[in-house]
Amino acid sequence: MELATEVAGPYAGKMLADFGAEVIKVEPPGGDPSRFGGPVLPANDNASNGADEAERNALFLHLNTNKRSIVADIETPDGRATIAQLLHQADVVIESFVPGTLHRHGLGYEALRRNNPEIVVASITPFGQTGPYAQYLGADIITYAMGGPMYSTGMDEREPVKLAGNVISCQVGNVASTALLGAWMTAQQTGHGCHIDLSEFEAQTASIDRRVTYLLHWQWGGGITTRQASNRARVLPSDMFPTGDGYVLALTIPAWAPRMLAVLDDDDLTARFDSPDWLRDDELADDILATLYPWLVEGDKADRTRTAQAHKWAVTALNSPVDLLDDDHFVGREYFTTTDHPVVGPHRRTGPPFRLADAWQIRRPAPLLDEHRDEILAELAAATPATADVADADADADAASASSPDPQPIRRPLNAPRLPLEGVRIIDMTVVWAGPACTMHLGDLGAEIIRVDNPYVFPPATRGISPRPPEDLLLDLGALGGAYPNFTTATGNPWNTQGMFAAQARNKKSCTLDIRTPEGRELFLQLVEQSDVLVENNSVATLDKLGIGWDVLHERNPRLVACRMAPMGLDGPYSSYVGFGASFEALCGLTSLRGYDDLDPTSLSTVFHMDPASGAGGAFAVMCALLRRDETGVGELIDFAQSENMMNHIGEYFIDADRTGVTHEPIGNRHPTNAPQGCYPCEGDDRWAVIAVANDQQWQALCEVIGQGELATDARFATRQARQANHHELDALLAAWTSTRSPHDVFHQCQQAGVPAAPVYDEADSFADPHLEARGFFRQQGSADIGTWLFPRHHWQWTGPALRWGPINRLGDANEHVFKDVLGLSAEEYQGLIEAGHITTSYLQEDGTPH
């Protein structure tokens, strides 16, 4: 039962619905606000109610496939009775009411579980169920301002700028669907459901776009990560560049310099790299650009992408959703699917976030408002109530139930609660960020995670720039270099201490093995025989080159689930493309939608959204496959194309592109329909606050807050449409008011009046936040190498079994466990692996050179 509105909760409901769940969407009178939150589509010529904007909004059409709609008002007796009846039938409830609303009506979690001990309730709210900000309102920009690194996104001489559309809320939806599926699996295994408290603020602080790395960097003496005017201060090109017909994003790490040189084919430039100190050559950056610019502008973006990618250099075209609908790669993968809607008519939309046989299907389009009332009420009338009517419970039901003995479970009771993935062993061959984030989630949910690390092949950007990067280079790069404790890499084991690695490394064990050797390959396959899942996100050809492709894995262990998280999928023209998350965000439409509305794409700072979205999405995919294996007894290959999962976060733009052909331009911090929304200057140096008015009531309240009540009836601002048309005037009015106040003054004055607002947080603000402190958000974590520091805890809280919080793994820390306990090797055989060079805890020999 989906009682959630807007984006995050409905996105979680869509994930469950599209993979087979029956989802009933309970809408408030007038409908879910997302019916008015995105591009408005033209009506089908045959539509009788085509003038109704609520049925033609691309955002709602995207978020609500495979759902049925019924309208019920929880504030009326009849509506409350209908909702109570629906909750009687539910396995899972997704809700986003202001905390306390369900409890006030006798429909809180404790009341519901008295009637159904297995019920899972997910409360997805801006700030969680408890804490000083629990009653405060949210929006996509609110979540990013406080939880994401909005402070460091954009240009240093401009205001911070949010990501495009609703991608932050969609990523929260990815996290929520993972939590929901995990909780439901626990309920099936133990008979005990749980209540999930998911704070959008916390989910973002724990995951989005290098936020955890920046928080560690601040603790390690690195200061605040600020906005940068350009990435071109670096020696190697990592920025957006113009071509003959558009733009490309080029990302270059030191290990890829030879690839770049092969493409540019300039002997004089290549000779400059013969010096061991080329990274410190102040003039080299300008000389590279002098060769790069002419090469780019003499060709088109597609050709330059193909040429660079042929040499494995991470150059990708900047595409819009319009560019992609008929792109050869997505046509070849049959990614886009067509849905016929009674008002909008046939339209193409994004396809599955991952491929798992026939698990994903669009069975019906998004519903019309209250479309299924009669059939849903008929089903309720036919159902026999299992218990007394919850609607008759008084407002103290939750408190009374909380003090009473636990109800008896009704399915497969166990002696003690257990996490859903306890007893599941997962081989982790992941790199960089997306894959490690996926296995981190799975470890949190109870799985044993065994990293298989090759000590002879250092993974750049996974455990650092290099095994022992120069400390002066790290000082120059700051948090962008991945962050190290006190910038110390000259001693110790820096491959165990890099911030980006540490951020995703809890609950994992590491063994070392050179799979390139016959002995190493055989030992790896023996581990496969003893495991349930393999997760990897290397280049597509890697497993086959190692002789451990899917056919080999499946033959050795038919029950194995393999989740392969290639950025562009396992087949298609772009499947072999290399890059980081930002590379594929440009290629697949997201980057074209974000940025300042008055500047060209070369002003964009590099952002990474695809990685955290893939982490939560990949964990959901693995659990889906494990559930299928429980039914069939056979494992499956998951083709998790990170780009296709991410494209679902901007799905409304693909629907609009298909129906209208419109290429959407960046709109900065504004909202496509609501107004005003923006980021405004405050008292202090580089201090900012965001305000996001969603309706006329909030606008009227804001007018009173700023002491200009007469503006509420001013014809220029009285309606949403008028405010959009006069947004520049509103921005000036609000900036004049905010500039005399601190960000927190703006935050509290607006929120206490019912107006969504937030300070734009830097790292120091996050650690000083009283709400996060009250909810125990930061917890101590570490290892012998990294020491003990404060890390964000899990992405959600729940009343189920305690999520795991194990130490950060170190290279080879579980060698004895894996080879002796899991594989059963004798002491003599283990010693032989040491002598053969498989077993180690370092990427370097004693003299400091690589193995």
Show the residue positions of the predicted features.
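Mid-domain beta-loop-alpha active-site segment that forms a flexible
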Residues: 142, 164-181, 200-211, 252-259, ...
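Aromatic-enriched alpha-helical interface/lid elements that frame and gate functional surfaces
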Residues: 237-311, 315, 322, 328, ...
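Short Gly/Pro-enriched turn/cap motifs at secondary-structure boundaries
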Residues: 51-52, 60, 226-233, 238-239, ...
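N-terminal helix-loop segment corresponding to the beta1-alpha1 unit
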Residues: 1-189, 368, 372-631, 810, ...
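A glycine-rich dinucleotide-binding beta-alpha-beta segment and adjacent secondary-structure elements
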Residues: 311-363, 752-805
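Short, well-structured beta-strand/strand-turn elements
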Residues: 22-23, 309-323, 383-385, 449, ...
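Oxidoreductase and adenylate-handling cofactor-binding alpha/beta cores
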Residues: 147, 173-194, 206, 210-219, ...
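Conserved Rossmann-fold dehydrogenase catalytic segment
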Residues: 157-167, 188-204, 228-231, 570, ...
